[in-house]
Amino acid sequence: MPNVLHSGDLGDIIYALPVVKAMGDPGIFYITTRPWTKAMTPDRFDTIAPLLRAQSYIKGAEWWRGEHPVVDMSTFRSRSGRGLNLVAWQAQAVGVTPWVCQEKWLEVEPDEGMNGRILLHRSARYHNDLFPWTETLHSVGKSGLF
């Protein structure tokens, strides 16, 4: 991947990861703050940086100080994303296939206490009324965690 810059919210940054992985060789993931999102503070940076650094396809995560060249992924919201999820929207903005999320893209150390559990995340901000929550809950049963 080339060096990338992102100024989105934490969720935007997380859902940029499959796109970043699809860009190729490891580069630096730079983070900055912009007026159109919740301010990226040092505390918020410290929250997300360990996850970014844990990815084999990212060489490092740093606060942006004007380094070049970078692919600015912050501009994805300036394009129409109607009907797209955050991965596809960001992929479209940088010319990457939106299907990149079909491959494993998040790497974390296993937690033995979670063995056999299925972690589900429902954003407080984005809801899809067409998602089959009832069927999903029945499918995962007591293995599911929110």
Language model region names:
Residues 1-146:
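Catalytic machinery of carbohydrate-active enzymes
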